[in-house]
Amino acid sequence: MSKTDKKIHVDVSRIQQIFRPDPSAVRSEQIQQLKQAIYRHRNQLLSGYLKYDIQNSDIERNPHGKPCLMAFPQLQFNHSHSRQHYALASSFELSDVGIDIEDLDRKVRFDALAQHAFHPNELKYWQDLEHDADYWFRVWTTKEAVLKASGLGIRLSLNELDTHVHPSAQGGLCHHPQIGHFAYQNFRLPDYMLTVAWRAAPSCAGFQFPQIHIVQH
C-alpha cells in the first residue's frame, strides 16, 4: 500500500487545554459545559481551515444525522473525544471521513466488550493474541471511526462489522453491505490510540493511503 497526494488533517488537543470544569457545578452541568467547549474548539479549528467564522448554526446534519457543513461541502470533517483528548479530522479531498480516539489508560472491561462488539473473526484474533490491549484498542477505534464515517453509527451493530484489523498492520480495508467499502489507518501514540477512516473503493491498481498529518496541540 502506497501514499497518494490526497490528505487528511488531524488536530489533537488535550481536554484540559480546551475545558476547565467549574468545581461549583453539578456533574450534569459540567458535562454540558464540556460539550459547549468542544463545539467552540471545533468551530475555531474549522474557521481556520475555511478562513470563515464558523458558528454552531453553520453545523447541520446530513440525511443520516452526521454533522456537516452544508455551506462548505468541499470540507469533510468528523471529531471524537475521550476523557483526556479531543481529535478533529478534516479533508478537502476525501469523502465520508471518520475518527475515533481512546485513552490507553482507560479502564475497560475488555473481555465483556469484545464478546459484545467484536466480529467472530476479530474475537478469534484477539484471543489468539492472548487478549492484547493494543489490538483491542485498534479494533475498537476502527469500528467507531468507520461507522462514524459512514454516518450509520449505532444503526449497524458493532459485531456485524469485520474490520479485518491485522496484528502486524496499521491499517486496511473493510466492507459491509449497508455501508460499502472503507479504509482506515491506526496510530498508536504514547497516551492514546487514534484511528482515521474514509470511504474508499477497491481497485485492481491496489489500495493507497492518503497523507495523514497529525498535529498535537
Q: Which stretches of residues belong to each language-model region?
A:
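Core catalytic alpha/beta fold that binds nucleotide/phospho-ligands
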Residues: M1-H217
